[in-house]
Amino acid sequence: MFSRTDSISKRILLPLVLFLLLAGLAPAALAQTKTFHWTQWDIDVVLQPDGRLAVTETQTLDFSGAPFTFGYRSIPVGRAGNNDGISNVSVREGDQIFTESSSNAPGTFEVVDQGDETRINWYFDPALGERTYTFSYIIDGAVCVGTS
C-alpha cells in the first residue's frame, strides 16, 4: 500500500518532471524562431520626362533562425500612394534575374494588386544570413507634368 507521503511525492514529482522536460525543449524551440532585419536599404529614384518615377531598391536582409524561402514588398498605390500604380516590375538577386510567375518556385516573383497597395512576392532557395535583392519598377502618374 502507498503511504500519504508517497502520494504527495507523486503529485509533486510528475509536474516537476513535465516542467523540466518542457524547459529543456524551450531553447531548441527558441533557436528555430525566424527573424530578419534590414542591414541596408538603398533607393534610387529617377524622374522621367512624362512624370513617371523609375525606382530601383536594393535591400540587404539578414535572415536568422529557421531558413526563409520568400519575402514580400508592399507599395501603396492609387489614392493611398498618390500615384496611378506601378508597372515594369523586376526582381533579382545579384546576377540571378527572377521570372514573373505565380508558381511560388524559387527564382520567381509575382505582382499582386491588393486595392490600395501592390504587393511583390518573391521566392528563393532557403536562406540564412545576409542576402541582397534588387527591385526595379515604374511608379506611374507620380508627378503631374504640364506647361507653364
Where are the regions that the model predicts?
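Lumenal/extracellular ectodomains and adaptor appendage modules
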Residues: 27-148
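N-terminal secretory signal peptides that target proteins for export/translocation
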Residues: 1-9
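Sequence-pattern detector for short linear motifs
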Residues: 7, 13-14, 76
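Residue-level detector of alpha-helical hydrophobic segments embedded in or interacting with membranes
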Residues: 9-10, 22, 71
